[in-house]
Regions:
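Hydrophobic positions on the alpha1 helix immediately C-terminal to the Walker A/P-loop
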Residues: 46, 50
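Pre-Walker A (Motif I) flank of P-loop NTPase domains
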Residues: 29-33, 68
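Short, conserved catalytic or adaptor-binding loops enriched in Gly and charged residues
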Residues: 88-96, 187-191, 301
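Helical mechanochemical/support elements of P-loop NTPase systems and associated helical scaffolds
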Residues: 78, 82, 106, 110, ...
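Conserved inter-motif catalytic segment of the P-loop NTP-binding fold
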Residues: 2-4, 10-12, 17-19, 23-24, ...
Length: 348
């Protein structure tokens, strides 16, 4: 009998895991995602522009990206049509954006084809499959939910294994629903097993405006009002109902930068760090919410020269912060481990 592989809560909280990485900041993280919309609504234009932005490292609307290799499986198009669309978007597409118009099916060689591509192009971080139905075999399954969940599970395992984002282009039901997510074609085995779901929906078929509904495990729910520019062939952002004056990661970066200005490396419990950076409590943070903010901001902090790790010492969970520009000069004297019962004053 194979025993259950378990981990106790204390060990789990003390284990360092790589933070979730984003292809498009705050919008498209690593994992498996669905983009659904009615036929001919402009899903493929949006998908192609997303691929182009990710390959070039240019922002998608207000959301930052970093240059990476991208694979777009355009299984309902020809290379000629893709070329035409690409020229409509840019005269200078990068060689890191790759296309294919034919592939094997999901349970008959596709995974192996993608694995081989990733081996040849290890900097790939985004794969778009347009459409999901093109890679699925004709189903006569007595349990469509199980079939949907099984197919999605294979693709999710592939995305998780390689820490990449896979975006599946899919269709909507014809029946309207107050909840756009309920309009995704198929059973909840599809939408429930993905990491994020996006629905592109027009209120009227002939309109050039639409709303992109976004929900997921690693992103906040948001509704993006979009308008399709027929000349540039780009969906342009009109508004974002999730806009904030300052992103939480930016605030955490500012607070920790101030703390690390005099000491390039500090280790302390969340409560002590919070007392040092916000003694008056103006930020409205608790030690738990402060620690949570830092964990959610690890990737953003690392990109801005602050590395974060976590460890236990004498029963306390310590947040370990290191400023990158002090790495060359770090000695044991620079490392400050704060005693929670007798913390020093840093004067920040």
């Amino acid at each position: 009998m194979n025993r259950l592989q378990t981990i106790d809560a204390d060990t789990l909280q003390s284990t360092a895991y790589e933070p979730v990485s984003f292809v498009v900041d705050d919008l498209l993280p690593q994992g498996l995602h669905l983009l659904a919309g009615a036929p001919k609504i402009g899903k493929s234009w949006l998908a192609l522009w997303l691929c182009l932005c990710a390959a070039q490292g240019k922002p998608l609307w207000t959301f930052a990206t970093r240059p990476c290799e991208v694979l777009y499986l355009c299984l309902e198009d020809s290379f000629q049509r893709i070329q035409s669309r690409l020229f409509d978007l840019t005269e200078d597409a990068p060689p890191t954006l790759h296309f294919a118009v034919m592939s094997q099916q999901l349970h008959n060689g596709l995974v192996e084809q993608i694995e081989q591509f990733l081996k040849e192009h290890p900097q790939t971080r985004l794969i778009v499959i347009d459409t999901l139905q093109r890679i699925r075999a004709a189903g006569n399954d007595a349990n469509p939910y199980a079939s949907d969940y099984r197919d999605i599970g294979v693709l999710k395992a592939l995305a998780d294994k390689h820490r990449i984002a896979i975006l599946l282009i899919h269709h909507l039901r014809k029946m309207n629903d107050d909840d756009p997510m309920n309009m995704i074609s198929g059973t909840t085995g599809l939408s429930g097993a993905t990491d994020s779901n996006f629905v592109l929906r027009k209120s009227q078929r002939r309109e050039n405006t639409a709303t992109l509904y976004c929900t997921g495990r690693d992103i906040p729910y948001r509704e993006l009002a979009l308008e399709f520019d027929g000349e540039d062939h780009v969906w342009k952002l009109l508004s974002d109902n999730c806009e904030q004056t300052e992103h939480p990661s930016e605030r955490i970066l500012f607070l920790l930068s101030e703390l690390l200005r005099r000491q390039p490396e500090i280790s302390a419990p969340a409560k002590v760090l919070l007392e040092k950076i916000d003694p008056a409590g103006a930020e409205g943070l608790t030690p738990n919410s402060f620690s949570h903010r830092i964990r959610k901001s690890v990737d953003a902090l690392r990109r801005n020269g602050i590395t974060v790790s976590f460890r236990k010492s004498n029963g306390d969970r310590l947040i370990c912060l290191k400023r990158a520009d002090g790495v060359d000069d770090l000695t044991t004297e620079n490392i400050v481990t704060i005693d929670p019962d007798n913390p020093p004053c840093f004067g920040v």
